[in-house]
């Protein structure tokens, strides 16, 4: 068959785009950014791609073009974000957007059909390029995802995406994709109309060839949904609803979302050309916002973190994982190990009930994915075969690492170390999922202390992205590197932190929670305190968080922190009454809020359990300015984060920012505690703490690190390059 004949190259170029003309007069443009693992778009590529298209136009008998990646698993992962850091004005950033718009418009205007054959990540500018093509076909491979994630960087699609996508898949669907930045898998993209076909990878090119035979795409009649939304009245209602819903989620903290709605609406109502102008202008302005700078900072920090092992050693391979404890944490750790890490897991519990709980929990998690059509039943069955359990140590002789997830009891954890050293192989690493107990204490008496380490997951394990890796003084570098490698295999972001009370995340969280407690004891209603912090940018308020984590679990950490770090960690004495009243939070339906088991709180809103007020001898009445509530809690967190850096609990400011955002939901648009302090300026940070100290006591006294930085007019990150780790 002619389509299968070898290609004959007509150009050889160092460009990221190379043209090959097949014997059947179909051109194939291979995308391969030199020296990079994935394809990303750079500003200099505009001329390269237009040059390749011009070469194609010179071929008189050309039937059409296919765009396909020459890299194994990446179509185009988006634009090179470092370009934006070089922009010194909104106008410069706007010009970048205009360049992309003009380039893709020329592709759309070509006299012959163009097909995007997509395998791997097709995101951001990569999808905008694909949208400019006549047809799109993607592979059914799990590595293939499509989306416009710019909003997650505080931006909007700047190369025509806000204008092309609504016309392709409909206004409401396009707004949802652009405002959430979520990724679609192949079948989802097909159902939405984002791609024309989704096929096995091995016939991707053949399918693209068949598509080209249809010729240039003609305008298609509007579907009933699009016809309905073409009515100005209906459209007005839709935009109003979307704006209200978005505002309720963002509380005005993410300017990109409002710009997206404005730009999409402008294009729909005033035409594509006006839409392009507004898109480029809005893109330029958003690039210069502090919110986008903060989100881009997190993006670069996350990427930099992935390149470090946390230790000066190579990781040893992990083939088999043991888990002690079949509870919620143990079951969650088993889930991410099997489903993301693709590793066999052996769970040990003291009784069959614990094993069955873990297996049932994993079955339920996988069934949810099957029901959402993100997994086939056969894949669910395969993954379940990776998880087994018993009430003894059979199978643990094969374990390369054993993760302990038992009760927070030092004697019990030491017993677990001893039993693993008796029953597992000499090379087996023992990782404790403790949230508060110092690792060096757990390792006391161990025969192989160099293989004992902390591995602190956050609940729920399948959703929370962070883990803290905690070596003690005698943990080997190989153990650290291996544990970090396992965490990444589980899909986690891992930060290496010091072996001190509370580690990092819980240490900065505790004073924040305590300050909320002081506000409550001053008579401020629970819902007012929580809402103030949610408006500030946290995903949930401190009392809702306590209910979710478990009041009993959270309070176990406080004595450890108080004993080692001082009275600023001591909870108000009145809070003892909460535990004595049997309040554990959501898990027993009794906490700061009421929980109706037939409803979900996010559907109906939480209702405060007002019986807690007389328990604390408090008469609740809103009287504290919400800005002051959030300031008090956040400043306690910032001060403690600076102490952690000063004491070496975290290795650098980058790790502190990642840990706070991914571990407790510190507002991403602020970039993390250290980025936020740099933005405020040390003078403002210290001055605010001193004012609060005068009003509320010495718990607000600024730490030595902050005082010294103010004196020396220093910042945590170099002013010219926020993407480097800081001192």
From Swiss-Prot:
CC per GO annotation: cytoplasm
Q: Where is this site: Important for catalytic activity?
A: 128, 150
Q: Which Gene3D superfamilies match?
A: 1.10.1040.50, 2-enoyl-CoA Hydratase, Chain A, domain 1, NAD(P)-binding Rossmann-like Domain
Single GO MF annotation: 3-hydroxybutyryl-CoA epimerase activity
Q: Which CDD domains match?
A: crotonase-like (cd06558)
Pathway annotation from the record: Lipid metabolism; fatty acid beta-oxidation
Record localization: Cytoplasm
Entry annotated with the keyword Disulfide bond? no
Short name of any one Pfam family annotated for the protein: 3HCDH
Which InterPro entries does the record cross-reference, listed alphabetically? Answer: 3-OHacyl-CoA_DH_CS, 3-OHacyl-CoA_DH_NAD-bd, 3HC_DH_C, 6-PGluconate_DH-like_C_sf, ClpP/crotonase-like_dom_sf, Enoyl-CoA_hyd/isom_CS, Enoyl-CoA_hydra/iso, FA_oxidation_alpha_subunit
* EC numbers for this chain: 4.2.1.17, 5.1.2.3, 1.1.1.35
Map out region (Enoyl-CoA hydratase) in residue numbers. Answer: 1-200
Predominant location of this chain? cytoplasm
The Gene Ontology biological process annotation of the record reads: fatty acid beta-oxidation
Which superkingdom heads the taxonomic lineage of this protein's source? Answer: Bacteria
PROSITE patterns noted in UniProt: 3HCDH, ENOYL_COA_HYDRATASE
Q: Does the keyword Oxidoreductase apply?
A: yes
Function field: Catalyzes the formation of a hydroxyacyl-CoA by addition of water on enoyl-CoA. Also exhibits 3-hydroxyacyl-CoA epimerase and 3-hydroxyacyl-CoA dehydrogenase activities.
Name of the protein in question: Fatty acid oxidation complex subunit alpha
| Provenance organism | Pectobacterium carotovorum subsp. carotovorum (strain PC1)
